[in-house]
C-alpha cells in the first residue's frame, strides 16, 4: 500500500507526461488501437470534438479521466507503452469505482478544508482530485489544459486555475502518515510569500519585490543572519525576488 506521500509524488510525476482527458481511460497510451477503442467506449468520447482530439493525440500521450487517474496510480501505472501504461486493472485491492462512489469509501469526510491532509481525495458531484499540499490539487479535467494538471484549492487560496470542492476525505487504499519536516536547501523551488528582499544577508534596508515562484541559491549562516536565504525568481515566474529573505517567508513548492 502506498503512503499518502508516495501517492502524491506518483500523481505529480504524471504531469511530466503528455496527457489528455479521455473518459473511462486509466492511463492507456493513445496508440491507433487505443484510439479506436476509446472513441467508441463512452458517449462523451464519441462527440465529434472529442473524437478529433483523441485521434490527433500522439502515441506517447496517455489518456485519463478524473477517477481513472487515481485508480491508475493505485493500480501501478508507470508511464510505459504497455496497454494501460503499466497499470494492472483492479490490482492492489482497489476496485473500479467512479468519482461519487470513491468519496463514499473515504473516512473522515468533511466540508471543512482548514486541516486537509496531503493525499486526501477532494470531491464535488461527478468529479474528484487529490490534495497535494501547499493549497494545490492534482486533477484530470477537460477544463483548462484538458488533461492531468495542478490547480489551486479554491476553498482556502486564490490562484489560477482554481476550483472549489465540496468534500474531502482519506482513501482506504492509501496509508496516511505525517509529512517529514522540510529543511530548505540550495536548489529547492519555493513560493516566496514576502514583499521585500535585501541586498545582503544582514542588510537593514529592504527593497520591494513581488513574491512567487523562486529558487534557493544560497544559505548564509542560518541562525545568525537576519535574512539567511537568497532567492532568485524562476524562469517564467511573475515573481521579482532576487535577494536575501527571512527564514519562514517561503514555503516548499
Name each model-derived stretch.
Residues 1-82, 125-127, 138-140, 146:
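N-terminal capping segments
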Residues 2-10, 59, 71, 79-154, ...:
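...with weaker cross-activation on analogous glycine-rich loops/strands in unrelated enzymes
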Residues 73-81, 194-196, 221-225, 229-234:
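Short capping motifs at secondary-structure boundaries
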Residues 118, 125-127, 133, 210-215, ...:
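Residues that flank catalytic or metal-binding motifs in active/ligand-binding sites
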Residues 168-173, 234-253:
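Intrinsically disordered, low-complexity, charged/polar segments
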Residues 181-221:
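Beta-loop motif signature
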Residues 206-243:
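Basic/aromatic-rich interaction segments and small domains that mediate binding to polyanionic partners
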